[in-house]
Amino acid sequence: MRFSIQPTILFFDSGVGGLSVYKETKQLLPDCHYLYCFDNGFFPYSEKDEKDIIDRTLRICQKINQAYPLDLIVIACNTASTVVLPELRRNFSIPIVGTVPAIKPAAEMSETKHIGLIATKGTIKRTYVNDLIKNYAHHCMVEKIGSTKLVEIAEQKLRGGEVDLNVLKQELSPWQTMKSLDSVVLGCTHFPLIKEEIECCLPQVKFFVSSGKAIAKRVKFLLKGIEVRSKIQKKNLIFCTKPLEDDKSVQQILDFGEFENLVILSE
């Protein structure tokens, strides 16, 4: 799918985990104009108040939209997606795509009908997620782990740090003796970044399922019906809400996403 004029797509997350979704979309649609924003000034979202998450997400997206007219927004954060989508859709007239844990495909893939959901504590406790399980995995035994530590490990890895497998194994230890567990939902956009390490800790699991490819296909479908707002060719940029601690982290993120520059948004 090629565009004569680049649509501008914003990916939004509290951290850099949403880059896993961004990469899937960019691979499918390389000719778009991409912006990525991570709200590291309020990271992580998982245990924050819902109203604060909604207010910050809306304010930041509106600020970016003023400078770079957006054609589509992807909330590349499972926790935020469970609370912010209605408010964003009320305030924007463009398509808004959320991130939903891939519970339905995991339940369909599972041969033993014993599946696991790894997500943030915020995502795990949402009624929305329990409804997904009730609607699409009612015939399965569903295990759940809510972890902030795994999010931090993924952030560290993307910024050039080492992954401590012992810490990872400790977080996943409740599942290590579950021999019938054969499908795991990576219910946070950070977790595909450490998928290989998670696989090492759970060798009995045959299927690790995330939402990235499905979101990319959804973006492609929605772009067919839009009229591009800005006709100017632009570079791909990444935004944050707080300065990063070191230049190495900045360069790692720029290189991973092939961004031209990192811009710090003032609060």
UniProtKB/Swiss-Prot annotation:
Disulfide bonds: none
GO biological process: cell wall organization; peptidoglycan biosynthetic process; regulation of cell shape
Molecular-function annotations in GO: glutamate racemase activity
Lineage: Bacteria, Pseudomonadati, Pseudomonadota, Gammaproteobacteria, Pasteurellales
Domain of life of the source: Bacteria
Residues the record lists as binding substrate: D13, S14, Y45, S46, N78, T79, T189, H190
Matches recorded under InterPro entries: Asp/Glu/hydantoin_racemase, Asp/Glu_race, Asp/Glu_racemase_AS_1, Asp/Glu_racemase_AS_2, Glu_race
Described purpose of this protein according to its UniProt entry: Provides the (R)-glutamate required for cell wall biosynthesis.
The EC number(s) this enzyme carries: 5.1.1.3
Catalytic activity line of the entry: L-glutamate = D-glutamate
Active site residues per record: C77 (proton donor/acceptor), C188 (proton donor/acceptor)
SUPFAM superfamilies for this protein: Aspartate/glutamate racemase (SSF53681)
Name recorded for this polypeptide: Glutamate racemase
Keywords: Cell shape, Cell wall biogenesis/degradation, Isomerase, Peptidoglycan synthesis
Pathway: Cell wall biogenesis; peptidoglycan biosynthesis
Family assignment from sequence similarity: Belongs to the aspartate/glutamate racemases family.
Organism field: Histophilus somni (strain 129Pt) (Haemophilus somnus)
